[in-house]
């Protein structure tokens, strides 16, 4: 055995050993319990970042722990390979997105392998490969035929200069990110998934997810947004019907969760696209201008929430069905046409947004809720409007004095009797629009035929292959300019037809990849029935909290779609979810001449610390001049505070990177990068290596202690007690608690006690062998390379076949225990007594303790309090 720890030598050797033994390559095995561990697959952006390292190390720790515990473990890996960044990089570098993506995959794959992850690379998938997205297209056609996928007009951000549709994140302050042009809203045909058909099941099944963080489930519940309310129809005033047709000429329909406040409505607001707005603007240029303004800018709901609320009156009126009041109709930029009915009733006295709008335009406010005897206070909406328990109606005629529920039911009865409304359950969730007017995505398998309409591509003609030798120019969709792609014949009539040139939202690929891993080479469907039955749901899923809503919701939705197609036999895709925290690091900058900030990498900064170790000043190493310390933030390119994992691996080895990531913080919390923490992790590994080296140097490996320990010295019994209590704790930390930092700390404490114990005797060496063999197995999930190497020196066998250390219950039973002795509540000594010592024996031993005698100062004991197994307190 080499004297010094050399990760550059031992890590490739350990990885080769695992690869040769194929320890990560699994198949269905009914003789073992299965464990499917999955970390969210990466986007192949070019290089791994520390967030990747943390995510995949957590997954590997859990996988290796289960492997040693006899499970048939599947830990696959793949690439979420479609998406906008590839198009942007392609335009920047004049290279096809496919070439850029495949190069990145190869490099990132070597990085992942260098970290020693126990990944079954034979299950690797890349979502941009036709053999993957073929089955996505197949499911799309099946769902289109069933009506779960449908086509309708949707609103998008249109860049009039680049002649292209922009994603919400590409719109910056209302302008295109590349052209700088003012963005317009456009209505174009798009494909949608009827996720709303599954809203109730998606909501209810959250209760099945016992091992998901409550925070994530709450976020999904809020996103689905089930509410009980009423549809209310305001009759259009006779003098306001001009230009309106059908039901729009009869009534304006709104949805409200607070029909009890209907008597407090003082105006109604409609979206710019509402037919009433269009009719009102027919002869009013000022309305036309405002509607045009509303149609410009982002369509993102988040932007709508924060922008300035604006509106114009239409001069049209509707009638409140409860009291006959005429309410003016306003066009408002905060009302969205695609949500609900595109109209809202406004109750300024009891809603903050309505109040601000009414105050801005001097509109009336009418109080209809009172809380106790308090006078109305416009600054307390949450109390007046949100409090459904304590408020009662006022200024509401015969409804006065009613509480929320009674008023709700009374209003519902009145409106229903008039045909002016009915109770309704509504969801915030909207159908999922999956059409993207971009190139680097999965083609939508639809053919447009003038005679037959929209025709799904037959299964035997799938996949519709995306051409890969395309370099986008940012000016519209490349596919729409490629007759060789879109010119085709209709599958129904054989006539000339045109392929759909939109591609799918990249959330589509990540909504089912976990099923494809089960049988990645299966050529007859999305997943083989045998594999789906064996692997079932993912047992452990790991990823960032930023995916709590959309990705996880769509994955749950797809699972139910695939279940209903008979493809899988589970209702939910992920049994247990761990959302790891971010990796954060200090940030530094200097202000530049343009008033902006030039961010400086932490590696280029030299710090000065105060006597408590806190940074007080920083200078740039290159010139010695000051830089601003800006606090810790998530590692990112924009703040230039990232640390390249490859540099860390090259300098310290993969095990040091893994150990630091697992020891620095609990997995669900943010991890603050620390160079000293990395160095500390490396020191511990050197110490572990040195401990085994020194042990073997003194006489080589022996048979580990097992059996009856009655003949051992007290010191060796104490060491075995520490070993087996540590094994029990670490097993719980890995399995139930998933707190890896405390598992590492427990092994460190074990080694501390080992160092203090005399193990020079024959029995001592046997116990030492037992301790060291257990320690390297306990640490193998986290630092597998060094542990694999040390195990081969200690045992000569294959660690992955050794199994998890078992707990010797006899070793946990101590014949003697140490008990604290207090006098008047202050620690004054310790006594060693038999573990089964009686209360009288404990009292006698405490009274005889030298420290107790000294501080009792000859006074008699008034009372003696005994806490069995812990302490004796003498009160004098």
Swiss-Prot record:
Motif ('KMSKS' region): 634-638
Keyword Aminoacyl-tRNA synthetase: yes
Keywords of this entry: Aminoacyl-tRNA synthetase, ATP-binding, Cytoplasm, Ligase, Nucleotide-binding, Protein biosynthesis
Gene3D superfamilies: 2.20.28.290, 3.10.20.590, HUPs, Isoleucyl-tRNA Synthetase, Domain 1, Valyl/Leucyl/Isoleucyl-tRNA synthetase, editing domain
Motif ('HIGH' region): 42-52
Official protein name in the record: Leucine--tRNA ligase
Recorded GO MF terms: aminoacyl-tRNA deacylase activity; ATP binding; leucine-tRNA ligase activity
InterPro entries named in the record: aa-tRNA-synth_I_CS, aa-tRNA-synth_Ia, Leu-tRNA-ligase, Leu_tRNA-synth_edit, M/V/L/I-tRNA-synth_anticd-bd, Methionyl/Leucyl_tRNA_Synth, Rossmann-like_a/b/a_fold, tRNAsynth_Ia_anticodon-bd
Reactions the enzyme catalyzes: tRNA(Leu) + L-leucine + ATP = L-leucyl-tRNA(Leu) + AMP + diphosphate
Example GO biological process: leucyl-tRNA aminoacylation
Domain of life, source organism: Bacteria
Gene designation per UniProt: leuS
Organism from which the protein derives: Neisseria gonorrhoeae (strain NCCP11945)
């Amino acid at each position: 055995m080499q004297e010094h720890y050399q990760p550059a030598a031992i890590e490739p050797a350990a990885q080769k050993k695992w690869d040769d033994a194929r320890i990560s390559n699994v198949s269905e095995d009914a003789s073992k319990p299965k464990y499917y561990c999955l970390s969210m697959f990466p986007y192949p952006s070019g290089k791994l970042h520390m967030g990747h390292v943390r995510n995949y190390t957590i997954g590997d720790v859990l996988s290796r722990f289960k492997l040693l515990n006899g499970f048939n473990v599947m830990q696959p890996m793949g690439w979420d390979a479609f998406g906008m960044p590839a198009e942007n990089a392609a335009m920047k570098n004049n290279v096809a997105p496919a070439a850029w993506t495949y190069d990145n995959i190869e490099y990132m794959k070597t990085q992942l392998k260098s970290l020693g992850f126990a990944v079954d690379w034979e299950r690797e998938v890349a979502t941009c490969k036709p053999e993957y997205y073929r089955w996505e297209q197949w499911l799309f056609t099946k769902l289109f035929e069933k009506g779960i996928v449908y086509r309708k007009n949707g609103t998008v951000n249109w860049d009039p200069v680049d002649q292209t549709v922009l994603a919400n994140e590409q719109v910056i302050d209302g302008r295109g990110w590349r052209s700088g042009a003012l963005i317009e809203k456009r209505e174009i045909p798009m494909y949608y998934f009827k996720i709303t058909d599954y809203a109730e099941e998606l909501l209810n099944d959250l209760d099945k997810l016992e091992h998901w963080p409550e925070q994530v489930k709450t976020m999904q519940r809020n996103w689905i947004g089930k509410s009980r309310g009423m549809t209310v129809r305001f009759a259009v005033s006779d003098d306001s019907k001009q230009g309106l047709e059908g039901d729009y000429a009869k009534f304006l329909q709104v949805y409200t969760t607070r029909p009890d406040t209907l008597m407090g409505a003082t105006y109604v607001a409609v979206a710019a696209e509402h037919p009433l707005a269009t009719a009102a603007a027919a002869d009013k240029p000022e309305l036309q201008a405002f509607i045009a303004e509303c149609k410009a800018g982002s369509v993102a709901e988040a932007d709508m929430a924060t922008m300035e609320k604006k509106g114009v009156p239409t001069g049209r009126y509707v009638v409140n069905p409860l009291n006959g009041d005429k309410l003016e109709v306003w066009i408002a930029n905060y009302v969205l046409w695609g949500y609900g009915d595109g109209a809202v009733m406004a109750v300024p006295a009891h809603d903050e947004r309505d109040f601000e709008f009414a105050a801005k335009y001097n509109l009336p406010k009418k109080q209809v809720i009172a809380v106790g005897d308090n006078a109305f206070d416009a600054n307390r909406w949450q109390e007046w409007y949100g409090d459904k328990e304590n408020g009662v109606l006022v200024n509401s005629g015969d409804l006065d004095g009613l509480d929320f529920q009674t008023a709700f039911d009374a209003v519902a009865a009145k409106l229903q009797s008039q045909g002016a409304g009915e109770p309704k359950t509504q969801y915030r969730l909207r159908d999922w629009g999956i059409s993207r007017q971009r190139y680097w995505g999965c083609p939508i398998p639809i053919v447009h035929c003038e005679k037959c309409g929209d025709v799904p591509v037959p299964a035997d003609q799938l996949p519709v292959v995306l051409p890969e030798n395309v370099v986008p120019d940012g000016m519209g969709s490349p596919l729409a300019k490629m007759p060789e792609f879109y010119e085709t014949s209709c599958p129904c009539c054989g006539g000339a037809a045109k392929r759909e040139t939109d591609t799918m939202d990249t959330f589509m690929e990540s909504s089912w990849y976990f099923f494809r891993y089960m049988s990645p080479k299966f050529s007859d469907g999305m997943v083989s029935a045998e594999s789906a039955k064996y692997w079932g749901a993912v047992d452990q899923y790991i990823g960032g909290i930023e995916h709590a809503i959309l990705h996880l919701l769509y994955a749950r939705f797809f699972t139910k779609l695939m279940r209903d197609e008979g493809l899988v036999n589970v209702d939910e895709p992920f049994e247990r979810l761990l959302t790891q925290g971010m990796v954060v690091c200090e940030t530094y900058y200097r202000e530049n001449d343009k008033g902006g900030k030039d961010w400086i990498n932490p590696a280029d900064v030299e710090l000065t610390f105060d006597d408590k170790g806190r940074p007080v000043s920083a200078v740039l190493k290159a010139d010695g001049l000051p830089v601003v310390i800006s606090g810790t933030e998530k590692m990112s390119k924009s703040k230039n505070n990232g640390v390249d994992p490859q540099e860390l691996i090259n300098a310290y080895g993969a095990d040091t990177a893994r150990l630091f990531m697992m020891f620095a913080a609990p997995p669900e919390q943010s991890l603050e990068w620390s160079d000293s923490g990395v160095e500390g992790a490396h020191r511990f590994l050197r110490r572990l290596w040195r401990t085994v080296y020194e042990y073997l140097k003194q006489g080589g490996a022996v048979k580990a202690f097992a059996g009856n320990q009655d003949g051992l010295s007290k010191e060796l019994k104490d060491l075995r007690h520490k070993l087996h209590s540590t094994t029990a704790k670490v097993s719980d930390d890995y399995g139930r608690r998933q707190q890896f930092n405390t598992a590492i700390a427990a092994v460190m404490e074990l080694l501390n006690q080992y160092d203090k114990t005399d193990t020079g005797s024959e029995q001592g060496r046997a116990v030492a062998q037992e301790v060291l063999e257990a320690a390297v197995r306990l640490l193998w999930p986290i630092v597998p390379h060094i542990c694999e190497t040390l195990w081969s020196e200690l045992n000569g066998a294959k660690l992955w076949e050794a199994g998890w250390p078992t707990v010797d219950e006899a070793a946990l039973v101590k014949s003697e225990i140490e008990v604290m002795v207090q006098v008047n509540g202050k620690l004054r000594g310790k006594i060693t007594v038999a573990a089964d010592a009686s209360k009288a024996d404990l009292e006698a031993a405490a009274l005889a303790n030298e420290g107790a005698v000294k501080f009792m100062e000859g006074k008699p004991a008034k009372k003696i309090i005994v806490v069995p197994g812990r302490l004796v307190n003498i009160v004098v």
